[in-house]
Amino acid sequence: MPQSRIPVEDPGPPACMRNDRMVEFSEGRVCSSLAKERSMNKVYPDANTALAGLLRDGMTIMSGGFGLCGIPEKLVATIRDSGVTGLTLISNNAGVDGAGLGLLLETRQVRKMVSSYVGENQLFADLYLKGELEIEFNPQGTLAERIRAGGAGIPAFFTKTGVGTLVAEGKEIRDFGGELYVMERSLVADLAVIHAWKADREGNLVYRKTARNFNPVMATAGRITVAEVENLVEPGTIDPDHIHTPGIFVDRIIHATALEKRIEQRTVRKRGN
């Protein structure tokens, strides 16, 4: 696999990668066991080293978050700095101008977006109208289920959402119990970059409030998953009943500090009211 263009030392591939290429599987994840090589310590010193050896032109990347909530901003910035191009991004939205996945749109590194709500990014609309960006729109629930199905190894499913609309054009329609359903194919990605509130060194993740959003399902649907976390603790510290994403789905972790809490929309009363 081509190396990242970031000038950093590659800490070495996980156990599921050999001879500088990813082992090919038709569906689902490559693997998630680093026990032999890293003694289950999946923590990398920074985003550069965590993504080293994983990035290439034309790859498909899932990015967690909803708006600017729960986005892996350090990892996204590192993808931008790597210079990879022709990317297909799977994300609920495209960030905003100057933040989130909007950074990758500004540098014209994205070829296609598989998304749901994109109305907050003016550049996104401009690129689409100029024919410089391919878009695959999805109802939001359908997008989430396509990702969940990909992580579960389910190749496709039927849903009533979108029947009789542009969403259903070119897709198989079937009758079940007198109701029409459209077939949707599942989604998997070469790489999933996600954000979590807390993790232990074995990759068990806890999300905080609405920042959970698309992160858990994307963790399962990436052939390689890299998590950006706010708090890092030792194994055994997190109550098993509180774990949202088990470590088996996480390959690499970075402890992200000095994160900026961005407010997408702020509405307050006028002074004196």
Regions found by a protein language model. Name each.
Residues 34-273:
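Conserved alpha/beta enzyme-core scaffold
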